[in-house]
């Protein structure tokens, strides 16, 4: 089994808010991240797939196809977007880095053909990242 990781970057803004909590509870729980005007991050996304080497191509996965899938499913949808308002997954889900990794997994996993999605890693900044391995990995 081989593991191959492709990296991409995108910028997005968001804020943390739980509509089931009072304004005071939201401010206490989320602090300055509860500002409805949002704040932004330059995210780094690492997508790792796993599989065997194709004897014909010598690849685990078609790198061009993986790049195009990441671009179509993630970057086109999330780059320079206000996640809370412009990305459907976050209409009812708080756009934490944890939830962002899950949403990206859910977008990418069904699109994988020759290799299986193994891990989604999302860096919010240089010293904070989340790894998600999916429900069945």
Residue ranges and their predicted role:
Residues 1-137:
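Charge-rich, low-complexity N-terminal segments
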